[in-house]
Regions:
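Long, charged, glycine-rich C-terminal linkers/tails
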Residues: 270-290
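Acidic, Mg2+-coordinating catalytic modules of nucleic-acid enzymes
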Residues: 1-69, 102-107, 131, 184, ...
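Long, acidic, intrinsically disordered low-complexity segments
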Residues: 66-68, 72-73, 149-151, 246-274, ...
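Short, ordered beta-strand-loop transition motifs
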Residues: 143-147, 279-285, 407-409
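Conserved P-loop NTP-binding catalytic core
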Residues: 123-178
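A general structural signal for short secondary-structure junctions and capping/turn motifs
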Residues: 142-145, 179-188, 251, 281, ...
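Switch/communication elements of ASCE P-loop NTPase nucleotide-binding domains
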Residues: 24, 31-34, 50-133, 286-428, ...
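Coupling/switch segment of ABC-type P-loop NTPase heads
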Residues: 169-269, 425-433, 437-452
Length: 497
């Protein structure tokens, strides 16, 4: 046991003379506990870390969390399980020079323009949780100093150990991020839906060594769109085979969960998506599952991109949970109750009616797996309909909204912003998140903005009034609410439409 660090923890709140040093702490430990030479030799490591003197004593005492960041973990300590992402700090990587992200317990929504780092943030979140990159590893910014690039994260479970933060410094010589060997908290089950149609899955029970805490290379499985459909040997059977297997199994438990999840994620105002009888199609020896529509059954491989993405998400969530239960049963331990779901561009391929319903449905999926499952959901979106959809579900105690924005000086900012109920989707479009001046076409927006400028002028010319009226007629429909204001203004100037 390191005597120095034990003394730091035990005496962290004490007051010390100005000339105190590291040996002062260790000597106090020896005196207070009356340690003899034999006890010191057999029970303690009496060495003092190098470079500690300059930061050991300060005016204000450190918090327990700050001290835990410094303390090395006990060599025989076992990691806590069932963690979720509590904090992610990025320095000198990605579009922002520095970024601090504190995901909420239940739902976190990330918005922002293209190219500002939403996908990059999810990739770093996945890496922090699993220790593996789902795609290309993040690289330092071109303007980064040698000591700058680092990723700092905190995965929380229960207890003090889960409050520890982990810092990974970029290795310039190896051009890589060092692998983390062991961590105080292991995350729960994770499913990551990437925007290119691929998926990544992490299961701590299947892919960790409980004794050594070393993460196996296959700890995080990343499946291409084709592998999710057709399988990968020794890892996943694939949607086609698993769906058919579940559907024809004497035990319908898994298939019922799958059907329930699909139905909850179905597009609104239509008949729920329902699995139908599998069929054979030319050139394929397999039984292909189908989905029942009002107009008939459709083989899954012929479905629309939107239906394929949502049904595939449902499949991966159910598959990951089912495999987790199998692994827990084989290991004779209780299954995890924490699931982390990452979804990039939640609205991809979905009709506006479906965009307005999909996120509330995602919030309900965990309970369909098991009423005791607790989910942390982190999504990115460009859609005002997705934000409007959770106005009645958003809880500031358990949910958060973050926004990436390009500032006037050309830097990317990342801030948490209050979630406001704006009601109309038009109001969301013209909010600070989406930054449209008008919820119209670009030509209509420009015409209305110019008309507003003329409204503020004292004596606009008749030619200007007729010119802008023509632009408004070209870009606005007759029932547009702006016409009432403009017609009244023209009448005051002696012009009738």
């Amino acid at each position: 046991m390191p005597a120095f660090w034990l003394a730091v923890w035990l005496f962290r709140s004490g007051r010390w003379p100005n000339k105190s040093g590291a040996d002062t702490l260790v000597n106090k430990l020896i005196r207070d506990f009356a340690l003899n030479e034999k006890e010191k030799q057999q029970l303690f490591d009496m060495t003092i870390p190098k470079g500690i003197e300059g930061v050991l004593f300060q005016q204000n005492p450190c918090s327990d969390e700050e001290i835990l960041d410094l303390l090395p973990p006990a060599p025989d300590s076992k990691p806590q399980r069932g963690g979720a992402l509590r904090q992610l700090e990025l320095e000198a990587i990605g579009p922002t020079k520095s970024l601090t992200f504190n995901p909420a317990d239940r739902l976190t929504i990330v918005t922002g323009d293209n190219g500002l780092g939403k996908t990059f943030l999810l990739e770093c979140a996945w890496w922090s949780l699993t220790g593996n990159w789902a795609g290309r590893p993040a690289t330092p910014r071109l303007d980064a100093d040698k000591t700058e690039p680092k990723i700092k994260f905190q995965i929380t479970g229960k207890g003090l150990a889960s409050q520890r933060k982990t810092t990974i410094q970029y290795n310039w010589e190896k051009q890589a991020w060092p692998l983390l060997k062991g961590r105080p908290t292991i995350p729960g089950l994770i499913v990551y839906a990437r925007v290119d149609g691929s998926f990544a899955v992490w299961d701590p029970l299947r892919y960790t060594f409980p004794q050594s805490q070393l993460l196996r290379p296959e700890a995080a499985l990343v499946f291409s769109r084709e592998e999710v459909l057709d399988g990968r040997p020794e890892h996943i059977e694939g949607l086609i085979r698993d769906w058919t297997k579940w559907q024809h199994s004497p035990d319908q438990t898994v298939f019922e969960k799958f059907k329930n999840v699909i139905q909850r994620l179905s597009p609104p105002e239509e008949a729920p998506l329902m699995p139908s009888a599998s069929v054979r199609i030319p050139g394929d020896p397999r039984e292909i599952p189908t989905i029942r529509h009002i107009y008939g059954d459709v083989p899954f491989i012929n479905e629309s991109a939107g239906i394929r993405r949502i049904v595939t998400l449902a499949y991966l969530i159910v598959w990951a949970w089912t495999e987790h239960l199998v692994s827990a049963a084989l290991a004779k331990i209780a299954p995890e109750r924490k699931i982390v779901v990452l979804i990039d561009e939640m609205e991809a391929h979905l009709h506006p009616k479906w965009q307005r319903d999909i996120l509330p449905a995602i919030l309900d999926v965990a309970a369909l797996l098991d009423p005791l499952v607790d989910a942390q959901i982190i999504i990115t979106t460009h859609s005002p309909l997705v934000l409007a959809s959770v106005e009645t579900r958003f809880d500031s105690e358990s949910d958060s909204l973050y926004h990436l924005n390009l500032t006037k000086n050309g830097e990317v900012s990342f801030v948490e912003i209050p979630f406001l109920r704006l009601g109309s989707v038009d109001d969301w479009l013209t909010s600070d998140i989406f930054e449209l001046k008008q919820a119209r076409s670009r030509e209509g927006e420009q015409a209305v903005e110019r008309a507003k400028q003329i409204l503020a002028e004292e004596a606009p010319s008749k030619e200007e009034l007729m010119e802008i009226t023509g632009r408004l007629q070209m870009s606005l429909p007759p029932e547009d609410i702006f016409w009432t204001r403009w017609a009244y203004f023209l009448e005051r100037k002696g012009i009738r439409l």
